[in-house]
A protein has these predicted regions:
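Membrane-interface helix/loop boundary segments of multi-pass membrane proteins
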Residues: 134-164, 201-208
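Transmembrane alpha-helix boundary signature
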Residues: 68-73, 97-110
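C-terminal membrane module of polytopic membrane proteins
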Residues: 217-254
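Hydrophobic residues within alpha-helical transmembrane segments
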Residues: 50, 54, 164-171, 186, ...
Length: 254
């Protein structure tokens, strides 16, 4: 059934896959909260990033099931041009990651801040990298691959697949309207769309999902590095802080 839907109605399949993926994240978060309430857990000791890890593991499971049910599980192990050669293809975003890390470590860390406990820092890194795994499996492995097969591998077909998969990736961030300021979420959606187009192009060129997983996870780590190390802000607060000036960063990726 999923194979037929993917072949005959690829856009409906992609939108449906995204809806199921996002729905699974919401449902899993509520189930975790309900379970903690049943066990009378003290939420003062809860860690958002640990809960986020559980969510993303569910999302990874959904993406893997979709790939397996449509006969595309081999994408998870396809080497393409190889991981390190793939990073050379993605050299531009990789170089930006290195520069942003340098800037964060040199200028972005609070002088009088206190590091969070090690287990919470590890949860932060794990959560951010798992976001990269889950979203790349879904938006590049499921969505972008489906659109590429539909539009074809001509120059125009690749552009259409990159642009449409990028838009779907950007729209997925509208779910943050539940927790963050509307303007910040809108800016995040625009930025995520541009990144989605870029990651799609890198994925098509390299044929290796793990290249974009690494770049995506690294970007998420750097975007929340100070908050993850020192607990100075949450993801929702960070997104709420995005403003119109963020549009200038979109030009860098285009």
């Amino acid at each position: 059934m999923l194979k037929r839907l993917r072949k005959n109605h690829p856009l409906i399949y992609c939108i449906g896959a995204e809806a199921v993926f996002l729905g699974s994240l919401f449902v899993s978060s509520y189930l975790v909260v309900i379970a903690l309430l049943l066990f009378r857990f003290n939420f003062a000791y809860a860690d958002d990033y640990l809960l986020g890890c559980i969510q993303e593991l569910v999302g990874i499971g959904v993406a893997v099931v979709l790939l397996r049910r449509t006969g595309k599980a081999q994408l998870l192990t396809r080497r393409g041009c190889g991981f390190f050669n793939g990073l050379l293809v993605g050299m531009y975003p990789a170089a930006l990651l290195a520069y942003n890390l340098y800037a964060k470590l040199l200028f972005g860390l609070p002088a009088d801040g206190t590091l969070l406990p090690l287990w919470r820092i590890l949860c932060f890194f794990a959560n951010m990298m798992l976001v990269g795994v889950a979203e790349e499996f879904l938006f590049r492995g499921v969505v972008a691959e489906t659109l590429l097969e539909h539009f074809g591998t001509s120059r125009g077909g690749i552009w259409k697949a990159c642009l449409l998969s990028g838009v779907l990736f950007g729209c997925a961030h509208l779910t943050n309207l539940f927790t963050s300021a509307p303007l910040g979420v809108l800016m995040q959606c625009v930025f995520a769309t541009s990144l989605g187009v870029l990651y799609g192009a890198i994925y098509f060129r390299t044929g290796n999902l793990w290249v974009t997983v690494f770049l995506h996870g690294g970007m998420d780590v750097l975007s929340m590095l100070v908050g993850g190390l020192y607990g100075t802000e949450t993801v929702a607060e960070s997104v709420s802080g995005y403003d119109i000036t963020m549009l200038s960063s979109v030009l860098v990726y285009l």
